[in-house]
Amino acid sequence: MRAPAVRLNIVHLQNQQNTEPTNLNNKMEDFFMNRIGLICRYLKENPHSSQRDLAQKMELSLGTVNTLIKECMNLHYIAPGKSIAGTYELTCEGETFLNQFKVDGALILAAGFGSRFVPLTFETPKGLLEVFGERMIERQIRQLREAGVENITIAVGYLKEKFEYLIDKYNVTLLYNPEYSCKNTLATIYHARKALYGKNMYILSSDNWLRENMFHKYECGAWYASTYMEGKTSEWVLSYNKKGRITDVTVGGENAWVMYGPVYFSREFSAEFLPELEKEYETPGTEQFYWENVLIHHFDRFEIDINRQPANQIYEFENLEELRRFDSRYQTRSNNEALELIAKVFRVPESEIHDLRCLKSGMTNKSFLFQIDGKSYICRIPGPGTGLLINRREEAEVYRTIQPLGISDRLIYISGDTGYKISRYYDGARNSEAFNWNDMRACMKVLHQLHESGLTVDHSFDIRERILFYERLCLQHGGIPFEDYQNVRAQMIELLDQLDSMNRPKVLSHIDANADNFLILKDGSVRLIDWEYAGMCDPLIDLSMAGIYSYYKEEDLEKLMEIYFGRIPDNTERLVVYSYVALGGFLWSLWAVYKASLGEEFGEYTIIQYRYAKAYYRKVKERYCLQGI
């Protein structure tokens, strides 16, 4: 009903400021209605405020605030204060007008891993870490509730079960992002989009820490929080116009306002923004996009303001060392088993463990890099359930046995009980390359040194026993999915019986001598790492396992055998290697099926290993005399 009056007075305001033409479009009206909404909100939150109070809180000139107040008075949204002269209070009409700006809820992004916070995030999602005794996500939930925002959705993924308790404690909703491990926050917003459409919503990061409560029951227009960074910064730097509207974003800058912390989506903003986000989600090559990438690509279409925050209000901890500087408790006690162990082994306080960095996780373990006194080390943490699959006491025995050879990683500590291992990190080292035959020559020399060392341990790697072991595990955890499994299993038994009849020699073997487990040091020397499966076995199994891990074709395997033997292999040697290729493929396919039943996924690895079992059984059957055929 009162739109014409709004239009006339807004035109007057713009003429006064000489910033926009008099023929205002709807977006300009929205801009000023948002400012009127802010006047109403501030008066609701702070009754009996003066013009000067409002100008200070809104960071506007007294003249602009005076014009906005006149507009609010004309619309009957505010009235002069009854008890204190020179102040204003919200009317019933103002309350009704303000309702359109009511915040409907908040979406908290908590799906990611937090790789820069290892080893803490191996056990605990980053948002559940405590700062001054309070978990970061719980602090934000508490602040939201204090502001009157009750409807809270948490987008989860990594260690999602850790957030379940929040349902009972705060009556939140958990929303699962199935792509958390392979895509970035664009995908998280995509999967949560139904919670955003048609609503006024905060978008928060679970791992932010906010000093003061910056949330409100009412928000007027979309915004992105910003903090001023002095000096050079690698954050996303904002450009904005005199109205506070963001006009551009660049990566990195100096002495600038940057994207930092909470965001607010109005329902109008979401109606325009989310369809474009859906398009980008469907576009190949956007898998690692942040949701902000969509905003950056289309600033000409979306209207979102900067919400400048004071210094020391918003904290986004980049790593554990930043958190240590902020919360001194982490300097001495992190309540993390790995860091406590390192401190004990090196006899230093946790504060001297620094430059922590996540290393690429293997198929069974998690590892991270750290420094003490300028030297780099690796700490290995056994993966979930590996205690059932790997005998850590036997692994420790192997490491003690091979130390005189000088072919393994330099061991600092290993526990036969927990499986934790600490070793030196070789700066400048690289993994060998499976198809670099010069690398393979160097690696095979190390294998020869191991096989011919005469060293022994008290345990064996019995591939028959291991196959039956993993078969039982699979049958206990959902079964084995291969349609022809029983037939292939019978073929593997034939190969096992054939090998047993040959009375093959048993020496200390690595079992997992794949290219990734050979390190080429800067001086060209080679180290063989990860001895979890090592034991007494036929030495040729190491060639077979190396081949199937690297997805070798037959000609590649032939080349590897020639390098190892220093000649063309004879038929018996080839038969043995091929047999172990089949058996190794069968074993690791069962291993992968079992791991998949626990929620881990290895893509095509399972099928490739199963194909090795079938293909190399046929090669043995067709080319060599297999007993019983």
What are these regions (language model features)?
Residues L540-P569, A582-E600, K614:
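Active-site activation/catalytic loop segments of kinase-like enzymes and analogous catalytic loops
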Residues L43-K44, M58, E93-K160:
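N-terminal glycine-rich phosphate-binding loop and ensuing alpha1 helix
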Residues D327, S334, L590-I629:
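ATP/Mg2+ or Mg2+-diphosphate-binding catalytic cores
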Residues E337-D355, L455-I511, K522-D523:
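An alpha-helical support segment within catalytic cores of ATP-dependent transferases
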Residues K44-P47, T91-A106, V258-K344:
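Conserved alpha/beta core of the MobA/IspD/sugar-nucleotide pyrophosphorylase nucleotidyltransferase superfamily
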Residues F163-W236:
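Conserved beta-loop-beta/alpha segment of the NTase-like Rossmann-fold superfamily
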Residues R357-I463, G479-E483:
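ATP-binding pocket architecture of kinase catalytic cores
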Residues L210-G285:
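Conserved core of the sugar-phosphate nucleotidyltransferase
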